[in-house]
Amino acid sequence: MKKVPIKVCVSNKQKDVPIRVQSAKKLVLCCLQYWKITTDQVYIYFLDDKALAQIHDEVFSDPSLTDTITLPIDSPGISSHPHVLGEAFISPKAAIRFLKDRSQDSDLLYEEISRYVVHSLLHMLGYDDQTPEERKKMRVKENQALCMLREKHALLSD
């Protein structure tokens, strides 16, 4: 049986940070390959704060700003056709605020947004960050993935 390539759908509906769609697709595919995850589809949406706050309100009844929202759909290992791993809604502007609040170099902007994508993918895989232990475990996985992405020159770029 012929293996069908993973369809990574990326939409950029914000103007705060230039995002190269192909760069985002490469990042997602590298992570899924690194983690040995098979799926048919993954959706990544880069949105402005207003749109993300609206989704946050619709899904969680909380209109506050956030950096990412992840909606896992089909868990890894579940048989469905097509298998949709999930959807990630990401605010690049949140990364700008994060770096500014910590007086960090804006050169780290694309790495921070890459972290948001990796973080969302981990949520799609079932990782959670509600407790300090879960956050620590998730941060380790994020850092491992970011290290791999750096080596493969697969972090987001402009």
UniProtKB/Swiss-Prot annotation:
GO terms for molecular function: metalloendopeptidase activity; RNA endonuclease activity; zinc ion binding. Gene3D superfamilies: Metalloproteases ('zincins'), catalytic domain (3.40.390.30). It is an enzyme of class 3 (hydrolase). Disulfide bonds: none annotated. Zn(2+) binds at H119, H123, D129. The keyword Transport does not apply. One of its GO terms (biological process) is rRNA processing. Its cofactor is Zn(2+). Single strand-specific metallo-endoribonuclease involved in late-stage 70S ribosome quality control and in maturation of the 3' terminus of the 16S rRNA. This is Endoribonuclease YbeY. The lineage of its organism: Bacteria, Pseudomonadati, Chlamydiota, Chlamydiia, Chlamydiales.
